[in-house]
Amino acid sequence: MTDIYSLTYEQAEKLLTENGFRATQCINIFRDIYKRRAAGFDEMTLTSADIKALLSDKYFFGKLKIDEILQSVDTSKYLFELSDGCSVETVLMRQKFGKSICISTQSGCNMGCKFCCSGRLRKQRDLTAGEMVSQILAVGGRIVRYKIYKQPCISDKCR
């Protein structure tokens, strides 16, 4: 099975048409997942039951486990555990022009930068597209849920 966050629009259209559904129904899949932030097939309210059954035979919703959150004035660093036990870092940075999320594209790193926990681990593997998207959705969801978007940048570097 594949992480549903790795599913491209073109792949979804092909899957639907090969199984007798209209390709235009693909929009509801992506609205459910990315606009409505469904975290499971039961939360996909715009997608028909038949299409959800088809998807659930081939895909799963990847989940990241938060191991640790480190906070500073304008930065939140998340340590996530992937489904296979590998760890990755994701950083939310609040700046005067807005917020940005720095995601990991691999588990571990061979560079050895002192400021980065990933650099302390040997590279284990590259992440899938779904694992990268999951980082954005996890931190983005926390921004909305905890109203982090209303928190101003208050350090001197932002002024």
Question: What is the predicted function of each stretch?
Answer:
Residues 88-105, 110-159:
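Conserved Radical SAM active-site core
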Residues 1-99:
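Flexible, acidic/Gly-rich N-terminal and inter-domain linker regions that tether
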